[in-house]
Swiss-Prot record:
Key word Transmembrane present: yes
Organism: Polyplectron bicalcaratum
Cofactor or coenzyme needed: heme b
Function recorded in the entry: Component of the ubiquinol-cytochrome c reductase complex (complex III or cytochrome b-c1 complex) that is part of the mitochondrial respiratory chain. The b-c1 complex mediates electron transfer from ubiquinol to cytochrome c. Contributes to the generation of a proton gradient across the mitochondrial membrane that is then used for ATP synthesis.
Protein name per the record: Cytochrome b
Lineage of the organism: Eukaryota, Metazoa, Chordata, Craniata, Vertebrata
Residues holding heme b b566: 98, 197
Cell compartment(s), UniProt: Mitochondrion inner membrane
Residues binding a ubiquinone, per UniProt: 202
Transmembrane spans: 34-54, 78-99, 114-134, 179-199, 227-247, 289-309, 321-341, 348-368
InterPro entries assigned: Cyt_b/b6_C, Cyt_b/b6_C_sf, Cyt_b/b6_N, Cytb/b6-like_sf, Cytochrome_b, Cytochrome_b_C_euk/bac, Cytochrome_b_N_euk/bac, Di-haem_cyt_TM
Length: 380
C-alpha cells in the first residue's frame, strides 16, 4: 500500500498531527473555539496590516494624512482600515474569553502552555499600544506620551529609559518611526510564540470541561472540531463585519480625528476599551510608582494563578463557591472597564479603588480560600 503523503511528508506530517489527526477530547465545548479564532484574528490583522503599511508614511508631518489618504483614495482602503482597527477589538474579546475559559476550567495547570499564553497577551498588548500611536491623532500622541512616561517612575534609570524609548526629549518623529517598526515586527513574534504555545499544548493534549483525563475517549480534530471551529468563526465574523461596516468608529475616540498637537491636551486622555481595566487600576493608586506596579501586577498576576490553585478538582464545573467568585471577578472587570473611561472625580475615584482592591482580593485571597473550603466540604 502506498504511504499516505499526509502522514509521510516532513512538513505535511506536522500539519497533520496538529490540525487533522490530532486526538481531541470528545466533550470540549464552544469555549474551546477561541484558540482557533485567535489564530484567524492574527492572520486577518497581519494581512490587513500589511496592506495598510503599503500606504502608510511613518513621519509626524505625513502620518495622519497618509491614513486619511488610505481611507479616501485607496481602493477599499476605508474597509481595510476599519477591519484592522476593529479586528484589534475582536482579537482582545477573543483573548479575554480564552483566558476566562482557562481560569474557569483550570487549564492553567498546564503551566508551560499558560505561561506562554501570558507572554502572548503581553506581546499583544504591546502591539496594540504601539499600533494605536501610528495614525498620529490627538489620542495617539497623548496616549503615547502618558503611557511611555510611566516608565519614568522606575527608580534611578526611569528618566533615561523614557528618553531612550522616545529617541529624544518628547514623543516626536523618532518615536513614531520606531513604533511603526515595532508594530510591523511584533505580530510575527506573536505568530512565533503561538507555535511554541501550541507545541506545549500538544504535549499534554487539551483540557476538557470535566477536568478529568480524556485519554479513554478521543476523537480526531478533523472533521469534528475543524467544522465546529468554522461555525465559531462564522459566528464571530457576523458581529465583526457588522461593526466594521455599519459603525466602524463606535469603539474609537473622536479625539483621534484631530491631528496630533503637542500644545493642546485632550480633556480626557484614555486608552482603547481593552486597556481600560488596567488603566482604572493604574489611576486608583494616588502614587506614580505604586500605580505603575499595580498596572503591571494586574496582568502579571496571571502567572501566579497556577500556584494559587488549592482545590482537589481541576475545573469549576462542580465548585459553586468558586463559580460565584469567578462571575464576581468578571463583573468586577466590567466595572473597572467602565471606571477607566470616566473622569477622575467623585464618585468614580472611590468606585475604582474598591474595584481594584476587589480584583486583587478575589484572585489572591478568595479563590484559594474557596478552593480549600470546597475540599473540606467534600468530606461531609
Amino acid at each position: 500500500m502506498a504511504p499516505n503523503i499526509r502522514k509521510s511528508h516532513p512538513l505535511l506530517k506536522m500539519i497533520n498531527n496538529s490540525l487533522i489527526d490530532l486526538p481531541a477530547p470528545s466533550n470540549i465545548s464552544a469555549w474551546w473555539n477561541f484558540g482557533s479564532l485567535l489564530a484567524v484574528c492574527l492572520a486577518t490583522q497581519i494581512l490587513t496590516g500589511l496592506l495598510l503599511a503599503m500606504h502608510y508614511t511613518a513621519d509626524t508631518s505625513l502620518a495622519f494624512w497618509s491614513v486619511a489618504h488610505t481611507c479616501r483614495n485607496v481602493q477599499y482602503g476605508w474597509l481595510i482600515r476599519n477591519l484592522h482597527a476593529n479586528g484589534a477589538s475582536f482579537f482582545f474579546i477573543c483573548i479575554f474569553l480564552h483566558i476566562g475559559r482557562g481560569l474557569y476550567y483550570g487549564s492553567y495547570l498546564y503551566k508551560e502552555t499558560w505561561n506562554t499564553g501570558v507572554i502572548l497577551l503581553l506581546t499583544l498588548m504591546a502591539t496594540a499600544f504601539v499600533g494605536y500611536v501610528l495614525p498620529w491623532g490627538q489620542m495617539s500622541f497623548w496616549g503615547a506620551t502618558v503611557i511611555t512616561n510611566l516608565f519614568s517612575a522606575i527608580p534611578y534609570i526611569g528618566q533615561t529609559l523614557v528618553e531612550w524609548a522616545w529617541g529624544g526629549f518628547s514623543v516626536d518623529n523618532p518615536t513614531l518611526t520606531r513604533f511603526f517598526a515595532l508594530h510591523f515586527l511584533l505580530p510575527f513574534v506573536i505568530a512565533g510564540i503561538t507555535i511554541i504555545h501550541l507545541t506545549f499544548l500538544h504535549e499534554s493534549g487539551s483540557n476538557n470541561p470535566l477536568g478529568i483525563s480524556s485519554n479513554s475517549d478521543k476523537i480526531p480534530f478533523h472533521p469534528y472540531y475543524s467544522l465546529k471551529d468554522i461555525l465559531g468563526l462564522a459566528l464571530m465574523f457576523i458581529p465583526f463585519l457588522a461593526l466594521a461596516l455599519f459603525s466602524p468608529n463606535f469603539l474609537g475616540d473622536p479625539e483621534n480625528f484631530t491631528p496630533a498637537n503637542p500644545l493642546v491636551t485632550p480633556p480626557h486622555i484614555k486608552p482603547e476599551w481593552y486597556f481600560l481595566f488596567a488603566y482604572a487600576i493604574l489611576r486608583s493608586i494616588p502614587n506614580k510608582l505604586g500605580g505603575v506596579l499595580a498596572l503591571a501586577a494586574s496582568v502579571l498576576i496571571l502567572l501566579l494563578i497556577p500556584f494559587l490553585h488549592k482545590s482537589k478538582q481541576r475545573t469549576m464545573t462542580f465548585r459553586p463557591l468558586s463559580q460565584i467568585l469567578f462571575w464576581l471577578l468578571v463583573a468586577n472587570l466590567l466595572v473597572l472597564t467602565w471606571i477607566g473611561s470616566q473622569p477622575v472625580e467623585h464618585p468614580f475615584i472611590i468606585i475604582g479603588q474598591v474595584a481594584s482592591f476587589s480584583y486583587f482580593n478575589i484572585l489572591l485571597i478568595l479563590f484559594p480560600m474557596a478552593g480549600a473550603l470546597e475540599n473540606k466540604m467534600l468530606n461531609y
